[in-house]
Design a protein with these regions (language model features):
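N-terminal phosphate-binding loop and flanking beta/alpha elements of the actin-like ATPase fold
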Residues: 1-37, 42-117
Length: 117
């Protein structure tokens, strides 16, 4: 069992590691990769992350969230940067309380607002 874990969430890939007796060990993904794609897809039946989300992305593009790490720490006052980042997303961006950023996705037939944090 690990005493501590480390998570490095990047815009494109996420790396997980844990501390073991012999040192730090990278946690392998379902496909035995040292990193997992930073992406989540929502279908009528399930939530998919990583490689599974990539596999369904073509048929479910509007409900597949990716690049959300690029929006962390931004708010609606960051107009120029938001305009640039919005070129990379296919889901709807909405303004929330306190000028926070939210993303509208359909999950199991219902609209939900998710935040990048």
């Amino acid at each position: 069992m690990a005493d501590a874990i480390g998570i490095d969430p990047g815009s494109y890939k996420t790396v997980l590691a844990c501390v073991k007796q012999r040192g730090i060990e990278i946690v392998l993904s379902e496909t035995s990769s040292k990193w997992t794609p930073t992406i989540a897809g929502f279908t009528a039946e399930e939530r998919l992350v990583g490689d599974a989300a990539i596999n369904q992305m073509k048929k479910n593009f509007k409900n597949t969230a990716m690049f959300f790490g690029r929006f962390m720490g931004l708010n609606q006052d960051c107009v120029k940067q938001l305009e640039e980042e919005n070129k990379f997303i296919t889901y709807k961006q909405v303004e929330m309380e306190n000028k926070k950023i939210g993303f509208e996705l359909t999950i199991r037939g219902e609209k939900h607002i998710l935040t990048p944090e």
